[in-house]
Amino acid sequence: MQIPTDKYGAGHTLDDGRHCVHFERHLPYPIETIWASLTDPAHLTKWFPGLVFEAKLGGKFEIWFSGECDGPAHVSGEVSAFEPPYVLQLGSIRWELSAHGEGCLLVFTDILYVDERGLEYVSNSVLGGWHKYLDSLERHLDGGAGDPRTDVEVDYSKL
C-alpha cells in the first residue's frame, strides 16, 4: 500500500485491514541528530517527557500522556524494533528515519486500537495528539523547548 506524504498526518487503512495514523516530516538535520532526540533521555525530557524506554530490542517502554488526552493515559509494552539510527518501534508506534537531501525524512506510524467511539473519532484524536508531539520534536531540534502535554495549541483546521 502506498501511503501519501503528509506533514499534518492522515488516517489510513493498511492492507491487512488495520487502521493507522501516518506522518512524514522532512527535517533539516542529520539522521544521527534526530535519532539522539528520539532515544537519548536527556533529549526526551525536553520534548517527550512522558516517554521512558530501554534502548534495545525487547526492552520495556512506558508512555504517560496527561492533560486532555482522549486515549489511555498510560501505554506500556516492548521495544519491537530497534535498528540504530533508522528504526524505533515501541509497540504499535514506529519512527523510521532515512537520509533525504541534506536532512532526514522522519516517517511516523501508529496502529490504532478502535473502541466504541468509532474509527473517525479515535483517528482524529490520535492525529491531533501525535501532531503536537512531532511539532514539539521539531521545536526541540530547532533549539526551542516546551512540553507538548501542556503548552501547544494545535490548529485543527490544518489537520
Spans of model-derived segments:
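Glycine-rich, flexible loop segments associated with nucleotide phosphate handling
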Residues: 19-20, 72-77, 122-126
